[in-house]
Amino acid sequence: MKPAAFEYHSPETAEEATELLADLPDAKLMAGNQSFGIIMSNRLATPDHVIDISDVEGLRYVDVGDDTVEIGAMTRHADVEHSDDLAEVLPLVPEAAQHIAGPAVRNRGTVGGTLGEADPAGNHSCTLLALDAELAVASADGERTIPIDEFFLAYMLTAVEDDELIMSVRVSREAFPVERTGMRFTVEKRAAQTWPTLGASAVVRVDDPDADEPVIEDARLSFANAADVPLRTHDAEAEVTGEPLSEGLLESVADTVYDAVEPQEEMHADETYKRELAATFARRSLATAYDRAQGLDE
């Protein structure tokens, strides 16, 4: 099947793109075209106008500042994967990027495109949820910021309005001091090019990395493809906060996660399997993040 006929637009600035969105209510945005082309070819979307933002200036960058990390919406997955500056301060993000499909997709697919698609299996959606990111979006009327925990509304539905363009995603570094924070992304895929069966992001900050049993000051645990939207398990996080990590605590967290996730059954993974996988990934990811917070190797 081929896409239905449409009129193609290729703006060069964000202002031009938002003006087109304001003038063309039926228009859809195209970024790296790694998913949208498939959707169009199967006629799951038949817009009269397609706005290709791949040539829009100023949307492809990774800016690691003293207080904030900002990633432009048109930044390729490969850019994130190979960013040494990003790996030093938020290693969770490039670690997840390297597990997105294969090199061809990573060299074309974009961070903003993944977030805008809002597939619950998306790696970036999972990691950025754990990091309390916020998204900057723009329209012809101005810009606004959306906290990521308010961004995903339902399956493949976001808080971005039809006339808005995702500009960037930002993460405050305040909660993640490099010297005592560990991060881990864990994923299972049937093959390199497939979506994750399930993914997990863990972030752990300890009080004293040199102590025999460091106490966890802050913990984050989120999942990909474990519900209709990317899922963060706050109850599991609360269980480990204020305690040194132990095998007993990990088992308790695993039980909490098993009950908290709401996975959809798939051909190759039923609901029970995904629940068990989420519980296993919770243990594994938290344990590794805890070790990394102490400067220990896996």
Model-inferred region functions:
Residues 1-298:
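C-terminal structural segment of proteins
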